[in-house]
Every structure is written in C-alpha cells, then in structure tokens.
Amino acid sequence: RVFLTGSIEFIKHRETVAFTFTSGFITGAFLVYLSASQHVFEDQYGMVESFPYIFAGLAVSIGLSTFLNGTLVMKFGMRKLALMALSAFCGIALLYVLLFWNQPNPSVAVLVAFLSVQFFCLGFLWGNFRSIAMEPIGHIAGIGAAINGFVSTVIAVPIASYIGQFVTDTVWPMFVGLAVCGLISLGIMLLVRKPRPIASLSKG
C-alpha cells in the first residue's frame, strides 16, 4: 500500500517523471559504450593490450566533472548546468555523426577525445537529473529513488542492447546512438522546462 501510494505520488509530478526518463536515455547512451567498448578497441582498433588503460583513463573524465559539479551547480543551478552539459553532449555527438558518416573509423586519438568530452558531460548530467527528479518528492525520497532507478534502468538496458548490436565494423553507430539519446533527453528537458518570469514593465 505504501509503495502504491508512493508510485501515484511519483507520477503526479511532471518534472519528476520527465527527468527519470532523461536519466534512462543518458544512462542508455553510456551503456552503449560499456557494451561495445571492448569490441571497438580490441577488434576494430587492435588495442588488446592498451584497452584496460584507455577504459580506466576515460573514467577520470567522469570523476573530474562529478567533482566540479559540486562547485558549478552553486553558480549556475542544477537545471542550467544540466542544460549546458546536455547541449554540449548533443552537439558534439551530432558533429561526429556528420564528420564520420560513410567514412572509415577516426584515429584512436580522435575517438578517445570524443569519449572524454562526452563522459565529462555525463558527470554533470547524472547527478543533476536525479536531483531535479527527486526535488518535488523529498517527502517520499526512499520510494521515489527506487522508482527512479528502476524506470531509468528499464529504459537504459534495451537502448544499449539495441544500439550495441550495430557497432560491428565501425564506431559510427555509437555516435548515432549517443546523439539520438541526447536529443531525446534534450527534447524532454525543454518540454518540461519552466518558463522564466517576465520582468514587470516599469511605469513611466
């Protein structure tokens, strides 16, 4: 009964539901990388020995942005910071989609640079998306967090599984997958974004 009541309360809040979905799509984008990274670096690039170091090195990018998030969120606010990071995530992914459409794989340095920047953006997205989703439902934080995690995972795993099967001969499908997940998340975010209050006109 408590869980049912909490679930009903959860879906009453538009922003909570919306940012739970965006968390799912962004997590799905990351899982695309996780599921395909070994195949990409070892089979497509032949970097069997170097793969563990590249994998670990890319994680530093997420750690750095997660660390910086605590400072920057005080300056810009959760929503603005998340919007800036998501816009950058989408823009860079779209750029790579266009640059490498019907082209051979980019050099490993170019690929690692792409992933580093994308992961840097992710560090700002995960925490802020979840915080925004939980903000209206602090009174049911436990149940809310459970529903948020469950729904976002249910969204993320099929996305990663579907997109990952196309990453066979080139990394281009991964660029497309990240761009699509980012754009859907951006669309949802803009859809529920609260309009800024219009300043009153001064008399005179």
Roles of regions detected by a PLM:
Residues 129-172, 177-178:
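A late C-terminal transmembrane helix in Major Facilitator Superfamily
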Residues 24, 56, 60, 116, ...:
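Transmembrane alpha-helical cores of Major Facilitator Superfamily
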Residues 65-80:
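Helix-to-loop junctions at the C-terminal end of transmembrane segments
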Residues 14-58, 62:
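Extracytoplasmic gate region of multi-pass secondary transporters
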Residues 180-204:
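Multi-pass alpha-helical transporter architecture, strongest
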Residues 1-20:
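Juxtamembrane intracellular "pre-TM" segments in multi-pass secondary transporters
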Residues 59-67, 157:
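Residue-level signature of mid-helix packing/kink "hotspots" within the transmembrane helices
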Residues 80-129:
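C-terminal transmembrane helical hairpin of 12-TM major facilitator-type secondary transporters
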